[in-house]
A protein has these predicted regions:
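C-terminal lobe and pocket-closing loops
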Residues: 262-330, 358-361, 366
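An extracytoplasmic/periplasmic, membrane-proximal ligand-sensing/linker region
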Residues: 83, 314-374
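Hinge/capping helix and adjacent helix->loop/strand transition within the periplasmic-binding protein
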Residues: 82-83, 108-114, 136-141, 154-239, ...
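N-terminal (or domain-start) structured segment
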Residues: 77-165, 228-254, 344-347, 369-374
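Secretory targeting and sorting signals
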Residues: 1-29
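Tryptophan-rich substrate-binding surfaces of secreted polymer-degrading and adhesive proteins
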Residues: 28-79
Length: 374
């Protein structure tokens, strides 16, 4: 049952990984207005694409004045108001996946004229990050990066907070996980590691993100393939990949697990080796064989998205959702996805709101089955 639930959680990631890491291609032809999405080319200024925007709003054929599409006619939200500045909240230390995502989104927004400037506020875990976020009032300029790890991080810390209290903006991407070891490690394949975990699970120190997060669930699912329970593992939680890196390089943990983008530069520099990647196929961003290539039938990916304050007005929420819809269509964001080997898994508005409620419940269910939460 646990394996089935985990597989269901990862299904979207697997499908997207198969198609999501190739470079974007130029549009071959104009779409009719009833098939248009924001950013598509159009012909007549002022023409409407009825119901084709966020939450069933209209798109308008507009001559764009900012960003990569400046000077061209595009299906657009002419009423959208770009941000002045944004404070991103990251529930990880500097170098962690949430902060990395905030920086990537902020930089792409600036390139597209959707944002003038941004800052990132770091808190070391899910309760602290979400707690800080919820304590702020009347903030139109505040957004939080969430993801798979947050529901588990809240539950395993005994927090009463929930991501479903906030207003859902958009889900933006998924990222494959990487198992990494020091360059001098005795482990050459994932099966070498699994052999030691099976023989004596407590003897293998495994570093990853917070208890109950995607790293922990991925490790638990992998261990289950050799009959080891999640509660028997020697799992050491860190507040993001940034704080884990020195302990992997220094050999203070036998293996580390986090998103591929957090380890890629260190693998490329020869400071650590990627023992296995959780994508169905090898990735350009990091050198290493997949679990599937090594005979382990497991794929997984960590989604990340954006939440807005619970007291944000409906009008300001819709404007934020439209900004994210525009960003998703932009060359700057597509380049970011390719550069980081992130998977283009996008949901915005009410579709993300309904999805995240179900995802939150599914994650807690999986963690309960693994006996990581009660």
């Amino acid at each position: 049952m646990v394996k089935k639930k985990v597989a269901l959680l990862a299904t979207a990631a697997v499908a997207a990984l198969l198609v999501g890491t190739t470079a974007p291609v130029a549009q071959a032809a104009l779409k009719p207005d009833f098939k248009a999405v924001v950013g598509d080319e159009c012909l007549r200024i002022g023409k409407k694409a009825v119901g084709r925007g966020v939450n069933g709003t209209d798109l308008t054929c507009t001559k764009v004045t900012t960003g990569s599409f400046a000077g061209t006619l595009r299906w657009w939200y002419p009423e959208v108001k770009p941000f002045g500045s944004v404070e991103w909240v990251s529930s990880s230390n500097i170098g962690g996946g949430y902060g990395t995502t905030a920086i990537a989104i902020g930089d792409a927004m600036k390139k597209e004229g959707l944002l003038k400037d941004y800052t990132v506020t770091y808190r070391s875990n899910a309760p602290l990050g979400l707690g800080y976020f919820y304590d702020q009032k009347d903030r139109k300029d505040l957004l939080l990066i969430t993801g798979f790890a947050m529901p588990g991080g809240l539950a395993t810390n005994g927090s009463k907070l929930s991501i479903t209290t906030a207003k859902a903006v958009a889900g933006v991407m998924r990222e494959a996980e990487a198992f990494v070891v020091p360059t001098s490690s005795k482990y050459k394949t994932i099966n070498d590691l699994l052999a030691d975990i099976k023989a004596n699970p407590k003897s293998v120190a495994i570093g990853g993100g917070n208890y109950g997060g995607v790293d922990h669930v991925t490790v638990a699912t992998l261990a289950a393939t050799v009959g080891v329970k999640a509660t028997d593992l020697n799992y050491i939680p860190y507040s993001g990949g940034g704080s884990l890196v020195p302990d992997v390089i220094g050999g203070r943990v036998a293996v580390g697990i986090s998103g591929t983008s957090e380890f890629a530069s260190y693998v490329a520099a020869g400071k650590m080796r990627a023992l296995a990647i959780t994508s169905p196929k090898p990735l350009k961003v990091i050198k290493g064989k997949t679990l599937v290539q090594q005979g382990v039938d497991l794929t997984f990916g960590n989604w990340r998205g954006i939440l807005a304050p619970a007291d944000l007005s409906d009008a300001d929420l819709l404007n934020t959702q439209k900004i994210m819809d525009i960003l998703h269509s932009s060359p700057s964001w597509k380049d970011t996805l390719v550069a980081k080997s992130w998977i283009d898994e996008f949901r915005v508005g009410t579709s993300f709101q309904s999805w995240i409620k179900k995802e939150n419940a599914d994650i807690i269910s999986v963690l309960t089955d693994f006996k990581l939460v009660k």
